[in-house]
From Swiss-Prot:
Lineage: Bacteria, Pseudomonadati, Pseudomonadota, Betaproteobacteria, Burkholderiales
The organism's place on the tree of life at top rank: Bacteria
HAMAP family hit by this protein: Ribosomal_uS7_B
Name the UniProt record assigns to this protein: Small ribosomal subunit protein uS7
Complex formation: Part of the 30S ribosomal subunit. Contacts proteins S9 and S11.
GO cellular component: small ribosomal subunit
GO molecular function, one term: structural constituent of ribosome
Keyword Lyase among record annotations: no
Swiss-Prot/TrEMBL keywords: Ribonucleoprotein, Ribosomal protein, RNA-binding, rRNA-binding, tRNA-binding
Gene that encodes the chain: rpsG
The family this protein is said to belong to: Belongs to the universal ribosomal protein uS7 family.
Originating organism: Leptothrix cholodnii (strain ATCC 51168 / LMG 8142 / SP-6) (Leptothrix discophora (strain SP-6))
Transmembrane intervals: none
InterPro entries in alphabetical order: Ribosomal_uS7, Ribosomal_uS7_bac/org-type, Ribosomal_uS7_CS, Ribosomal_uS7_dom, Ribosomal_uS7_dom_sf
Job of this protein: One of the primary rRNA binding proteins, it binds directly to 16S rRNA where it nucleates assembly of the head domain of the 30S subunit. Is located at the subunit interface close to the decoding center, probably blocks exit of the E-site tRNA.
Length: 156
């Protein structure tokens, strides 16, 4: 982290098909080894499948799934007097979005369907309904924060 000046945020261009910056960011999260075309094919394929299965606007389902998975609080380790405490802190909006995208990707990868597009489509559908691996991860993080509420006075 530089001390001299604030590092400017990179401008991320919206994706060509839906015109969404969030979808573009998600594409960058899915992308491996700079293969953006592959990530694009996976995401657009998944959204196509979501549209077929749900019969609703795929972007609406994608955004609902993201909002459902976003964590509100998380725990951070804080050392006080020789002991480490898990202190619950509120998650900043940018990190909130990044964590949600990362968790969606990870839980889609762990699924057993054949193609990544199928896995992602099913994970998005489940997250939209409030279940699935990503939702489980979010609930786990919230549970940890709730369990350590007593240490919230050690805030940073």
């Amino acid at each position: 982290m530089p001390r001299r000046r604030e590092v400017p945020k990179r401008e991320i261009l919206p994706d060509p098909k839906f015109g969404s910056v969030d979808l573009s960011k998600f594409m960058n999260v899915i992308m491996e080894s700079g293969k953006k075309a592959v990530a694009e094919r996976i995401i657009y394929g998944a959204l196509e499948q979501v549209e077929k299965k749900a019969g609703k606007d795929p972007m609406e389902i994608f955004l609902t799934a993201l909002n459902n998975v976003k964590p509100m609080v998380e725990v951070k380790s804080r050392r006080v007097g020789g002991a480490n405490y898990q202190v619950p802190v509120e998650v900043r909006p940018i990190r909130r979005m990044a964590l949600a995208m990362r968790w969606l990707k990870e839980s889609a990868r762990k699924r057993s369907e054949k193609s990544m597009a199928q896995r992602l489509a099913n994970e998005l559908m489940e997250a939209c309904e409030g279940r699935g691996g990503a939702m489980k991860k979010r609930d786990e993080v919230h549970r940890m924060a709730e369990a350590n509420k007593a240490f919230s006075h050690f805030r940073f």
